[in-house]
Regions:
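Non-heme di-metal
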Residues: 1-179
Length: 179
């Protein structure tokens, strides 16, 4: 049987959306319960949010043919999704909110749309970095920082293994200072 176009596919999409929304909502509820002094209730909300995340992941995998795609494919899908959000979705929502007199909400849709555009550009740059072999290696020396222990290495490439904590190259990034 073909899942594409079936009622079951539609149900999987609804289940994924519902579980994803519930996870976020319960995370917000956990934060509020913690602020209100209810540690146990916060923990229960957080545990439930974690359960909902796993449910969403299960439905997502079924929609994707049983697996989460490669990082490069995921970056491309993410860039495409962000493009839709800023070029179509938020643009339409901004116009509709204005027509209905919700000027502040229209403004928020516009501003979030600008953020989504930045997200798309960031994903496209990461795609370019993977395609050009620039994630862990650059022309000229760079300051590489281990995200696990904070060890600093200066060179054209991140080390294969962190000499301090033994974590793999995957934990290194170019050190950014914005302070």
């Amino acid at each position: 049987m073909e899942l594409k176009g079936s009622k079951t596919e539609k149900n999987l999409m609804e289940a994924f959306a519902g579980e994803s929304q519930a996870r976020n909502k319960y995370t917000y509820f956990a934060s509020k319960a913690k602020k209100d002094g209810y540690e146990q209730i916060a923990a229960i909300f957080q545990e439930t949010a974690d359960n909902e995340k796993e449910h969403a992941k299960m439905w997502f995998k079924l929609l994707q043919g049983g697996e989460v795609k490669s990082t490069l494919e995921n970056l491309k899908a993410a860039a495409e999704g962000e493009n839709y959000e800023w070029t179509d979705m938020y643009d339409r929502m901004e116009k509709e909110a204005k027509e209905e007199g919700f000027d502040h909400i229209a403004y928020l849709f516009t501003e979030v749309g600008k953020i989504e555009k930045e997200h798309e550009e960031r994903y496209k740059k990461l795609i370019e970095n993977i395609d050009n072999g620039l994630v862990f290696s650059r022309d000229g020396d760079r300051i590489w920082k281990c995200r696990n222990c904070g060890h600093i290495v200066i060179g054209k490439s991140a080390p294969e293994i962190c000499p301090v904590c033994s974590h793999p190259k995957a934990y290194f990034e170019i050190k950014a200072e914005n302070y």
